[in-house]
Amino acid sequence: MIKTIAPSSPILSKYVECFYIYEGKSNSAFSYVAFPHFNTGLSFFKSASVHRQNWSLQISENTDAGVHIEILGKYTTPLLLEYKGQLREISVVFKPAGLNRFFKDNYLSMAPKFSQALTNDVWGQFGESLFSSDDDINKIESFLLSQFWDNQELSNIENSLTLLENSNEQISIPEIASKVGLNLKTFQRHFQKHMGCSPVEYRRICRFRSAISNKLNSNQWKNLTELTYDEGFYDQSYLIKEFI
């Protein structure tokens, strides 16, 4: 039903976590809950309609629909995704800040909501050609490489991510700004623009993902209380309040 593929290009591997392909069959139904994540998803759909409502996405078969591109924003509330019918989805999962390397527009300007259609002429034209052959992943890789660009402003933000992601070393936001060579106000503005959330919100998402990873990878499963304190949350109610 879903096939996941790692990028073959060393350049793309730095900025893209994976690609995945979903093939829905006629009369099929599939749903899952997406929890807050530091990665960013961008999906190409064929023969599908996308409906957004109350932190949920319904993707339904629509043979009259052309190619549609959907981009997720940063969200701190779990999302329900529901798929119905025969449709095709090809997705790019970008690593933190990775999406910005392939667009001249910043992430926040493109994705201010939890999910929205991508309106970009170059990407729209590529989307129309994407489903015309079976060589879709190679097509996407070639296209992404053609769109890749460097940005010094973004480099400063990328340098801050490791410091924010380290749940064992609680460096203050002003200290992180100083370490990447920016004053606090400029750092917060650039971070919001390229990451779609504040540094504080990003750190919360990272701690939440760390808690999930800790739970899944531990040989001795920890209870919620242990996870709460291991990841720096004061109590269970605080953890639940943040993300549920």
What is each PLM-predicted segment?
Residues 224, 240-241:
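Membrane-associated alpha-helical segments
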Residues 153, 191, 195-216, 242:
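Alpha-helical DNA-contacting segments of helix-turn-helix folds
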Residues 1-174, 179-184, 197-198, 213-217, ...:
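Alpha-helical bundle regulatory/interaction domains
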